[in-house]
Swiss-Prot record:
GO terms for biological process: cytochrome complex assembly. Keywords: Cell inner membrane, Cell membrane, Membrane, Transmembrane, Transmembrane helix. Its main location: membrane. It is a multi-pass membrane protein. This is Inner membrane protein YpjD. The gene is ypjD. The keyword Transmembrane helix applies. Residues 24-34, 84-89, 147-181, 229-236 are cytoplasmic.
Length: 263
């Protein structure tokens, strides 16, 4: 029985239940309890995932689609929990915790295998590590873009009043672009290590991943150029950011999903 996975699922659920009162009330007690529950969930999630990705013995690493998705969600949740502990980014927590809960549940109760042996190819280990960090970073940037769009829409339609709990739009936009820049640097390193260490990068098996990753990189470069040189703001930067995240998701997971559906 995956005890730590079940504990993580319960802790994520408790944290989600506590986030709503934490958003509606200024009492910090709800928020502290939500953060404590989230930390418990993250620790249990990490232990459960370690057991799934690194099984006993020299049997390699199980980098199945669900395991990788759960690992990415763990990385995103860890970053957003740290941000929330500083009383920022609370509007995004229900999304990231629900995403992590669903990913972990699927990885636990619908297990599958995709065994690799990264210990024999350290270059590939670096490449995969960079790809995970770049993807998680750019997904967080996309979440900030969605938060920016939502608050902007609510204010323009007079559905949301200004209050001390709501972050300024300019502050969210600055953070979004700062995170996007970090993600683009990591994505650039990912593409470079792929060229060096993946000898079959442009084979039939990997051509879709390579092309879509390059397209996503180009979208982000255009976004940053448009913002810093042409002054792009508002909906345009949101659409570019979300489009880049969608294309990158298709690059990282699209072919694996199709392969598993076929098999």
């Amino acid at each position: 029985m995956p005890v730590f996975a079940l504990l993580a699922l319960v802790a994520y659920s408790v944290s989600l239940a506590l986030i709503v009162p934490g958003l509606l009330q200024k009492n910090g007690g709800w928020r502290r309890m939500a953060i404590i529950s989230a930390v418990i969930a993250l620790v249990c999630h990490a232990i459960a995932l370690e057991a799934r990705i690194l099984p006993d013995g020299d049997s390699g690493q199980n980098l199945s689609l669900l395991n990788v998705g759960s690992l990415v969600s763990l990385m995103i949740c860890t970053v957003m929990t740290i941000v929330a502990s500083r009383n920022r980014g609370w509007l995004l927590l229900p999304i990231v915790y629900a995403f992590a809960l669903i990913n972990l549940a699927l990885a636990t109760f619908m297990p599958n295998e995709y065994i690799t042996h990264l210990e024999a190819t350290p270059g590939m280990l670096v490449h995969i590590g960079l790809s995970l960090f770049s993807y998680a970073t750019l997904i967080i940037a996309a979440l900030y873009a969605l938060q920016l769009a939502w608050i902007d829409y609510q204010l323009k339609n007079k559905k949301l009043a200004f209050n001390q709990e709501m972050p300024p739009l300019m502050s969210i936009e600055r953070k979004m672009f700062h995170i996007t820049q970090i993600g683009v640097v990591l994505l650039t390193l990912t593409l470079c290590t792929g060229l060096f260490y993946m000898h079959n990068l442009f084979s039939m098996e990997n051509i879709d991943k390579a092309v879509l990753s390059i397209v996503a990189w180009f979208v982000y470069i255009v976004l940053l150029w448009g913002h810093y040189h042409e002054g792009w703001r508002g909906r345009r930067v949101v659409w570019f950011n979300v489009a880049g995240a969608v294309i990158l998701t298709l690059a990282y997971f699209g072919s694996r999903i199709v392969q598993q559906l076929i098999s």
